[in-house]
Regions:
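Metal-cofactor-dependent catalytic cores
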Residues: 2-315
Length: 315
């Protein structure tokens, strides 16, 4: 099914887009917060559960977020102009991914596309512009959490810029996912994902959704507040109770239906401050996430958001 041109919109004239969800758990939100919507498929009962407040793209994995007012919701994630969510990846010369877990200052690097050029910006660095399309560059085999994937190398100028910025003693490179290249199949890591689901460089799903209420609740348990940006979601919602997003089976946003697949595990990356690129551990955030939200202390922790995949274009 072709999802091209499907828009998820926020900031309309009344600055509100209704989020609907299917499932009996939604009824527990309470009167005044939930109301029913007429839908074309009588077997699914949709009720209003919240509003979309932010759309975020992270074009470069571990890079700075880009806030947008509209985005195309495609099978492999959000798209805005030439930007695709998590379609650029920093790697070592032998193809292993480099993320904010090893290099927290990556969160300060912004990647944008203007006039057919790829633009990189970072603190105390000159802006770098190179051609976005470099079809003569090599296709590189690389790995995201031991899953094989490919990317088009973005060239030596980009490599030198990133290596200098990170003050790395080892050369790093940037690759760009193109549609004909080998993609990840999330079902190889999590069997709940559809077998035909494909993503570029996300940890798992093409869409990650969380609520502002969940972050507010979490902050009551910390000695220093964290922001939604530390969790790097694609879609942020409000007007719902904390952690109710974990109960939503199917949701409709505008003309798109999304299906929840699994909760999002969390690691030390959540302790990287997106404003400074410094690891801060307020009451050790990842340990706090574990006991109160059903997890166990291990390398990844039960998070406060959920992985979704695009199901269909409704109209």
């Amino acid at each position: 099914m072709d999802f091209k041109g499907v828009l998820v919109k926020i900031f309309t004239r009344n600055r509100e887009v209704v989020l609907c969800a299917a499932g009996t758990a939604v009824a527990l939100l309470g009167l005044g917060l939930v109301y029913k919507y007429n839908v074309r498929r009588p077997e699914k009962k949709f009720t209003r559960v919240g509003v979309v407040t932010q759309l975020l793209l992270h074009p470069m994995k571990s890079g700075k977020a880009v806030l947008v007012e509209t985005a195309e919701c495609l099978r492999m994630g959000l798209k805005y102009g030439e930007l695709r969510d998590r379609h650029w990846l920093v790697i070592t010369e032998d193809g292993h991914m480099v993320t904010g877990r090893q290099q927290p200052r990556l969160v300060l690097v912004s990647l944008s596309c203007e006039g057919g050029q790829l633009c990189l910006n970072g603190p105390q660095m000159e802006e770098l512009r190179v051609p976005l399309q470099q079809s003569n560059n090599a296709v590189v085999d690389c790995r995201v959490f031991s899953i094989d994937v490919q990317g088009r190398d973005c060239g030596d100028d980009v490599s030198n810029w990133l290596t200098r910025y990170l003050e790395s003693d080892k050369t790093v490179r940037l690759v760009h996912y193109e549609p004909h290249l080998k993609a990840q199949r999330p079902s190889e890591k999590e069997p709940l994902f559809p077998k035909d689901e494909k993503v570029a460089y996300p940890d798992a799903a093409p869409i990650m959704l969380m609520s502002e209420a969940s972050v507010r609740d979490l902050n009551t348990r910390l000695n220093k507040d964290v922001s939604v940006f530390q969790f790097r979601p694609s879609i942020v919602v409000n007007d719902c109770e904390a952690f109710t997003e974990d109960t939503w089976d199917h949701i409709e946003i505008g003309q798109v239906e999304l299906k929840r697949v699994v909760g999002c595990g969390r690691c030390l990356f959540t302790t990287v401050d997106p404003e400074t690129g410094i690891i801060t551990r307020p009451t050790h955030l990842n340990v706090v996430l574990s006991p109160f939200h059903g997890g166990t202390v291990r390398s990844c922790y039960r998070g406060c958001d959920s992985h979704f995949c695009t199901v269909r274009h409704l109209r």
